[in-house]
Amino acid sequence: MMNDGKQQSTFLFHDYETFGTHPALDRPAQFAAIRTDSEFNVIGEPEVFYCKPADDYLPQPGAVLITGVTPQEARAKGENEAAFAARIHSLFTVPKTCILGYNNVRFDDEATRNIFYRNFYDPYAWSWQHDNSRWDLLDVMRACYALRPEGINWPENDDGLPSFRLEHLTKANGIEHSNAHDAMADVYATIAMAKLVKTRQPRLFDYLFTHRNKHKLMALIDVPQMKPLVHVSGMLGAWRGNTSWVAPLAWHPENRNAVIMVDLAGDISPLLELDSDTLRERLYTAKTDLGDNAAVPVKLVHINKCPVLAQANTLRPEDADRLGINRQHCLDNLKILRENPQVREKVVAIFAEAEPFTPSDNVDAQLYNGFFSDADRAAMKIVLETEPRNLPALDITFVDKRIEKLLFNYRARNFPGTLDYAEQQRWLEHRRQVFTPEFLQGYAEEIQMLAQQYADDKEKVALLKALWQYAEEIV
């Protein structure tokens, strides 16, 4: 690295393997990261480390079959989650780092936020403080396929639709990726895909990189004029290359990072004919339950989640034809919407009454219940700076009700030796509430079902045996 007194911008490619799909209630197993310069040349040593699972948690069997990481391996190679979080935090908070991965905005970043939340680090600052940012290559690949597909091979899945699974893309483009779902292998594969797009479609790549920033995206969005844009998102469906023309109707009434978009390729008649209550109900009805009713062609775009938005003409006529997007239909819908501005009030009303948010009484699931105050954040910093053995004597008051529970869990999971007798009893009671007879019976049945399903697969059977032994040991 050139040391000219100025900090160099770097990319930090990373990937988690986890013991389950829920970012708040499941736990990390393995983390891998590689830092590169702006041209994707590796700098520094690759980082791979494991997280020791705490004794109030059992992994999801299906997840272990995918990753091949058993809780025994994570326990043998890993450190407690407090130490695991500290290492990730120090990598993520190097100034001028762009933290990225593959599907990280929806998955890995949520895991990071929850790991930091459980371990007394700021869940969000890593992605913006000190000139830091985040980005996600999954949507870059989707955008490349839809908007500038030349020069890259695009694999199809069994349904004949484009596949954006990392292992399919690497194979189709002759990139080494032998050990898919090993965190390090996935990181190298992601770097290779980034290089591929940067070489084959440099203008698109640079555009998307610049527009990962919400202020750049805001400049594209013109609500008063309903200026149409092209949008690429997995929510739009692979059958049309995850792409459509959209128009911004209004900003979300409560979340200033969300804009309400109408999908111009959809059927807009519900927006004209139905009232906001009916629209809201239909919007939150699963597609399979809609019957003959037309879906509501409205979607939120969160400008702080690196969405792909570009000028409408970025989608060329030949690509719209290839993706089966009817340009005239979209233009007709745009004209109708502009003639019916009352639709704006309707969609704002849909989102003014938020979708039903069921609060959980489990503190692990309460990250999004609210931000911590400055005073509480300062107190949490003191927790981190205190030697674990001195935590019991820490005389500190918190305003937010979550923190006392978080601190107890933090001590019990990471430093059980610091619990006194009464606290040990409290933790035992917590574990009893987690490992109920019903839960354990369901867990055993799931392992048995998978063991029958994969009876001929020695490796999978061995993983399931290890899980069974682990459960018997810790419960």
Predicted region positions:
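Entry/capping segment at the start of metal-dependent catalytic domains
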Residues: 1-41
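N-terminal glycine/serine-rich phosphate-binding loop of ATP-dependent small-molecule kinases
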Residues: 2-4, 18-23, 48, 72, ...
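Metal-dependent phosphoesterase core characteristic of DEDDh/y 3'-5' exonuclease domains
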Residues: 26-31, 35-36, 41-69, 90-202, ...
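Metal-dependent phosphoesterase signature
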Residues: 67-84, 91
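Acidic catalytic cores of enzymes that act on phosphate-bearing nucleotides/polynucleotides
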Residues: 210-290
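Long, charge-rich C-terminal accessory regions
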Residues: 253-430
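C-terminal non-catalytic accessory extensions
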Residues: 423-475
